[in-house]
From Swiss-Prot:
NCBIfam families: argH (TIGR00838). CDD domains: Argininosuccinate_lyase. The keyword Nucleotide-binding does not apply. One of its GO terms (molecular function) is argininosuccinate lyase activity. The lineage of its organism: Bacteria, Bacillati, Actinomycetota, Actinomycetes, Bifidobacteriales. It holds the Pfam family ASL_C2. It catalyses: 2-(N(omega)-L-arginino)succinate = fumarate + L-arginine. InterPro entries: Arg_succ_lyase_C (IPR029419), Argininosuccinate_lyase (IPR009049), Fumarase/histidase_N (IPR024083), Fumarate_lyase_CS (IPR020557), Fumarate_lyase_fam (IPR000362), Fumarate_lyase_N (IPR022761), L-Aspartase-like (IPR008948). This is Argininosuccinate lyase. It is an enzyme of class 4 (lyase). Keywords: Amino-acid biosynthesis, Arginine biosynthesis, Cytoplasm, Lyase. One of its GO terms (biological process) is arginine biosynthetic process via ornithine.
Length: 490
């Protein structure tokens, strides 16, 4: 393709000179917005057809325009066309490319009836809708990996913790599923967000709409949107939906980071709950023995990056008056970075989760330690008629007695229980507390909805699988149920 290197600007006329070199360098955005080129060309096709329907392009002109756009798309795809130094943004570059193919007279007609304001507002929506589906699919892969590990864990019991201290025994599967549900909600958030962003700003113009008789609804349909934005000012200026996506991305990072923190702790020599596959671990340049959980550490670190992208975007938006301002150029890098981060992070993280191996014997050994069955003693006492306030004190007395001897609760003698419970239970009944002094007994007793009993965990795994089956339709569909296709293929 022959490049037209003559400077092309999308504005001028009232200016006596072009932009200063300093302004040109500051304004330049092709280094990050070129990734919108495919969406821009798809939007240009739809806009050209709208111009044709409005009688602003003849049938012959429309055909030549579409042919030129197809040629431009091929040149973008094969890399023979790319931005040059003088191109301010991807829209400027693509108009230059179109004029180079179609000629100045025909190529110059495409800009009629649209502004970069409504154009870029639409492109970022198209791009985010597409990539939200990619991210949703990757998140569901991670959820499935957690479900697989939960099924594999079976009845294995581990120490549940609050404040990082031993609290109560729980099934390993229950602990893992506690991380699956937030990730499911992240996908649900993307689906809910898509309902709001599923509106095309095309036709809003700079801010007041267009006067050329164009059909925004037809353009919206061609670009995969179910409707047109209700207010042209809002259509060009609103970035709350971009910020909402940024929040979902940041929340996803936080959810992954919390799981990462547990994996990092579980993987230490002191805990030794889990071993990571060699393919998802790294070594040390100086210490031959090291096997490091780098994926979990990188995930934990990148969550801060995702939060920073959201915070920066919100700070940019907070002081803007309504209608377009150039500050809004700053919306794109934040979400581009988030998408790039998640689309690289999630496959690696899923691989780590899917291949990690838990030491069931170690988990079972640790599950009842640290007086983790103290609550079970208190609840047993309640079932035997002791008010909970007193039951709590009596259980605490058992802990104090065992702790003073360097023992665990199950090491206490029958006489210890008889003496401790003497004010509330007859001597022949007190030793019956031993029936709850096992981690499996503790787990099995917690059989309410959402509890850690084996049957309830199997129930929630089945519920999660059903939810995933429903949610996995989103990565392949638009919110109105039609197939979601690549730009330009609607």
């Amino acid at each position: 393709m022959t490049e037209n290197n003559e400077h092309l600007a999308l504005w001028g006329g009232r200016f006596t000179s072009g932009p200063s070199p300093e302004l040109a360098r500051l304004s330049k955005s092709t280094q990050f917005d070129w990734r919108l080129a495919d969406d821009d060309i798809a939007g240009s096709r739809a806009h050209a057809r709208a111009l044709g329907r409005a009688g602003l392009l003849t049938a012959d002109e429309l055909q030549r325009m579409e042919d030129a756009l197809d040629t431009l798309q091929r040149h973008v795809d094969d890399g023979s066309f790319a931005p040059i130094e003088d191109d301010e943004d991807e829209a400027t570059a693509l108009e230059r490319g179109l004029i180079d193919i179609a000629g100045d007279e025909l190529g110059g007609k495409l800009r009629a009836g649209r502004s970069r304001n409504d154009q870029i507002a639409c492109l970022i929506r198209m791009w985010l809708r597409r990539h939200s589906r990619v991210i949703a699919g990757l998140l569901l892969d991670l959820v499935n990996a957690l479900i697989e590990q939960s099924e594999k864990a079976g009845r294995t019991v581990m120490p549940g913790r609050t404040h990082m201290q031993h609290a109560q025994p729980v099934l390993l599967a229950h602990q893992l599923m506690a991380h699956a549900w937030p990730l499911i909600r992240d996908v649900q958030r993307l689906i809910d967000w898509d309902k709001r962003i599923n509106a095309s700003p095309y036709g809003s113009g700079a801010l007041a709409g267009n006067t050329l008789g164009l059909d925004p609804e037809a353009v919206a349909r061609e670009l995969g949107f179910s409707r047109v934005t209700d207010n042209s000012i809002d259509g060009t200026a609103a970035r709350d939906l971009v910020a909402e996506f940024a929040f979902v991305a940041a929340m996803t990072g936080v959810d992954i980071s919390r799981l990462s923190e547990e994996i990092i702790i579980w993987n230490t020599q002191e805990f030794a709950f889990v071993k990571l596959d060699d393919g998802y671990s790294t070594g040390s340049s100086i210490m031959p023995q090291k096997k490091n959980p780098d994926i979990a550490e990188l995930a934990r670190g990148k969550s801060g990056r995702l939060i920073g992208d959201l915070t920066g975007l919100l700070a940019t938006l907070k002081g803007l008056p309504t209608a377009y301002a150039r500050d809004l150029q700053e919306d794109k890098e934040a979400v581009f970075d988030q998408v790039d981060t998640l689309e690289v992070l999630l496959p690696a993280f899923t691989g780590m989760v899917r291949t990690m191996h838990f030491d069931g014997d170690r988990l079972e050994e640790e599950a009842p330690t640290g007086f983790a069955l103290a609550t079970d003693i208190a609840e047993w006492l309640v079932k035997n008629g002791v008010p909970f306030r007193h039951a709590h004190e009596l259980s605490g007395a058992c802990v104090k007695l065992a702790e003073g001897r360097g023992q665990e609760l199950w090491d206490l003698t029958d006489n210890d229980f008889i003496e401790t419970f003497a004010a509330f239970l007859p001597a022949d009944k007190a030793p019956g507390v031993r029936e709850v002094l096992s981690s499996h007994g503790s787990v099995d007793s917690r059989n309410g909805k959402g509890g850690t009993a084996y049957g309830r965990v199997r129930e929630q795994i089945a519920d999660a699988k059903a939810e995933v089956e429903e949610l996995k339709l989103f990565p392949a569909s638009t919110s109105d149920g039609s197939a979601y296709k690549a730009p330009g293929t609607f």
